[in-house]
Amino acid sequence: MPKTKLILTEPDVAPLIGSNNIQKRNSDGSAAESHPSWNPHPIQGWTTDFIPLVLQEAIDEKYYDELIPVSGDDGIFWSTELAKKEGIITGVSGGSTFAIAIKVAKKAKPGSNILCMIPDTAERYMSSILFDSIDSEMNNEEIDLYKSV
């Protein structure tokens, strides 16, 4: 599809692809060791400490158009914004994906279509940094709203 663009993203503090550092491999293609550019990051489910062979093959074949790194803070921000404004409950990875979709949308031509897949919910992250700013008890305004519906 000549008009379709594939955008990759990865945590800005763990730039496995963006660093251009080589993933050392065993003779069977599996990772021989952790990638030298891997660092801990808050985007759960993203960027293990190695580049899988299937991803490396796609990178080598240039099956993507652009790589845009994302910060964990941006992922947390957009995850909470999606919950507050759209009722979409997702984890930091979903917020990070959406953060990049917003960046792409801001520079896209008018009339462009952008697909952003957010494949999980936030229920598994209730005790994570994602919900640090949310009180566990309802305030009076929330109680009144609850009683009104």
Give the ranges of each region predicted by the language model:
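Ser/Thr-glycine-rich phosphate-binding loops at phosphate-binding pockets of nucleotides
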Residues: 93-97, 114
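Short glycine-rich anion-binding loops that position phosphate/pyrophosphate groups of nucleotides
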Residues: 95, 120-122
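Surface-exposed, flexible loop/turn segments at secondary-structure boundaries
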Residues: 14, 122-123
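Buried hydrophobic packing segments
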Residues: 79, 97-105
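Active-site/ligand-binding loops adjacent to catalytic centers
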Residues: 1-92, 129-149
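Catalytic phosphate/nucleotide-handling subdomain of diverse soluble enzymes
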Residues: 102-119, 126-138, 145-147
